[in-house]
């Protein structure tokens, strides 16, 4: 899985077993993290079954690959999860080299990752819908099961006041859970008709949440009441969301990656004017969609960094957010230098068609059988 995001002043790009921390202006690499091919060499403990044999899900013979990467709000910690040997790795961020603090086994592959606003713990959701809390101070402490969904969780955010954890899943639900009393659900934000793939809180506007979905909508919610505030139709199902504040508490740029559409990315300016929210401006960025498999993107003040695959090799391209054209100020040689770090690793984008609900039409089959039965009865009466 390819992860890319921007946290000032660094662009973070992850694929395979490597994470790069890049200057977005000249693409010079600040530092990197390379996860060992065998995590047992850095403290990973393989859990044993009742018979004393190692669990296959954590076997050392499986290829290790990074799934999710996250920076702590105080910029002191970096968390990442792996598949193959399923683990949560916690690093101390330093100017030159990140220092590994802990390696903790996960029961199942992760689906989303988020730090607490005070950087004291990290939340990991897995593909069965469970959400665990891992302490970042007492790194040997066992994880706490906080909440669970009945389907895979695609995104998770923790409100700045530490009072609510918000999760979204494949079954089109957005759940607002009280914290620390996570057995108590505060509210649901219901209305999406397909998977909810991304969430974002609006800085400076307490109680407001952005969501995107496979039902081709972007929605603004009051998550405290569960009420929808605004709905914006999209040209295609939405799978990734990035946000940037343009004017403090009043104007935001929302960037959405589309699934299987001629235009790869949509840019929407959300504005508060006369106590009402509206989409003041919208534009589409083609990003050469169709000529390569786009998997993720990051948004900076003036550029869009798009990651994808060409001939099963990781490819990074840069576009201007103002006009959607390829950024000529970024020399191709600089991009090649970044991509060379992943040259030995294949890049096969995730099949996002699996995110959509499988619908079975039993009625049509029943009606067809009934029709044939009536025709057979009529033929018998005619005889």
Curated annotation (Swiss-Prot):
Q: Which GO terms describe its cellular component?
A: cytosol; female germ cell nucleus; male germ cell nucleus; nucleus; tRNA methyltransferase complex
What is the tissue specificity?
In testis, it is present at high level in hub cells, a niche for germline stem cells of testis. Ubiquitously expressed in all testicular cells throughout spermatogenesis. Ubiquitously expressed in all germline and somatic cells of the ovary.
- The WD repeats extend over 61-101, 105-144, 148-187, 191-231, 289-329
**Pathway assignment:** tRNA modification; N(7)-methylguanine-tRNA biosynthesis
Which Pfam families did the record assign?
WD40
Keywords for this protein:
Cytoplasm, Developmental protein, Differentiation, Nucleus, Oogenesis, Repeat, Spermatogenesis, tRNA processing, WD repeat
**Where does it mainly reside?**
nucleus
Localization per Swiss-Prot or TrEMBL: Nucleus; Cytoplasm
What does the entry give for GO biological process? Answer: oogenesis; spermatogenesis; tRNA (guanine-N7)-methylation
Question: Other remarks?
Answer: Wuho means 'no progeny' in Chinese.
Q: What does this protein do?
A: Required for the Mettl1-dependent formation of N(7)-methylguanine at position 46 (m7G46) in tRNA. In the Mettl1-wuho methyltransferase complex, it is required to stabilize and induce conformational changes of the catalytic subunit. Required for binding of nanos mRNA and repression of translation by the mei-P26-bgcn-bam-sxl complex. May cooperate with mei-P26 and nanos to derepress the BMP signaling pathway. May cooperate with mei-P26 to suppress expression of a subset of microRNAs. May cooperate with mei-P26 to regulate bam expression levels in germline cells during gametogenesis.
Subunit-level organization: Forms a heterodimer with the catalytic subunit Mettl1. Interacts with mei-P26 and weakly interacts with bgcn; required for the function or formation of the mei-P26-bgcn-bam-sxl complex. Interacts with nanos; may be involved in mei-P26-dependent derepression of the BMP signaling pathway. Interacts with Myc; the interaction may be mediated by mei-P26 and may be involved in the regulation of ribosome biogenesis.
Which family does this protein fall into?
A: Belongs to the WD repeat TRM82 family.
What is this protein's record name? Answer: tRNA (guanine-N(7)-)-methyltransferase non-catalytic subunit wuho
Tell me the organism: Drosophila mojavensis (Fruit fly)
Task: Identify the coding gene.
Answer: wuho
């Amino acid at each position: 899985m390819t992860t890319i995001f921007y946290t000032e002043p660094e662009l973070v790009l992850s694929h395979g077993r490597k994470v790069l921390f890049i200057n977005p202006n000249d693409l010079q690499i600040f530092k990197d993290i390379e996860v060992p091919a065998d995590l047992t060499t850095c403290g990973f403990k393989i859990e044993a079954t009742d018979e004393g044999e190692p669990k296959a899900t954590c076997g050392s013979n499986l290829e290790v690959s990074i799934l999710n990467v996250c920076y702590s709000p105080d910029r002191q910690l970096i968390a990442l999860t792996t598949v193959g040997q399923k683990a949560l790795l916690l690093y101390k961020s330093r100017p030159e080299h990140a220092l590994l603090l802990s390696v903790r086994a996960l029961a199942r592959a992760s689906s989303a990752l988020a730090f607490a606003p005070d950087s004291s713990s990290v939340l990991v959701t897995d593909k069965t819908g469970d959400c665990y809390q891992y302490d970042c101070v007492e790194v040997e402490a066992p994880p706490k099961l906080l909440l669970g969904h009945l389907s895979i969780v695609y995104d998770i955010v923790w409100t700045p006041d530490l009072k609510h954890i918000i999760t979204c899943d494949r079954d089109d639900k957005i759940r607002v859970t009280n914290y620390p009393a996570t057995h108590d659900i505060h509210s649901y934000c219901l209305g999406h008709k397909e998977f909810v793939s991304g969430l974002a809180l609006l800085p400076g506007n307490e109680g407001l949440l952005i969501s995107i979905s496979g039902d081709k909508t972007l929605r603004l919610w009051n998550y405290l009441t569960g009420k929808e505030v605004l709905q914006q139709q999209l040209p295609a199902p939405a799978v990734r969301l990035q946000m940037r504040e343009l004017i403090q508490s009043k104007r935001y740029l929302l960037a959405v990656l589309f699934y299987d559409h001629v235009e790869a990315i949509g840019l929407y300016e959300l504005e508060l004017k006369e106590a009402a929210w509206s989409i003041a401006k919208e534009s589409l960025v083609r990003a050469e969609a169709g000529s390569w498999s786009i998997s993720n993107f990051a948004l900076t003040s003036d550029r869009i960094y798009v990651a994808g695959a060409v001939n099963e090799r990781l490819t990074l391209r840069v576009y201007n957010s103002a006009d959607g054209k390829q950024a000529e100020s970024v020399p191709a040689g600089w991009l090649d230098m970044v991509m060379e770090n992943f040259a030995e690793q294949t890049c096969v984008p995730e099949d996002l068609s699996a995110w959509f609900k499988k619908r079975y039409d039993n009625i049509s089959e029943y009606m067809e059988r009934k029709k044939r039965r009536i025709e057979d009865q009529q033929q018998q009466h005619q005889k």
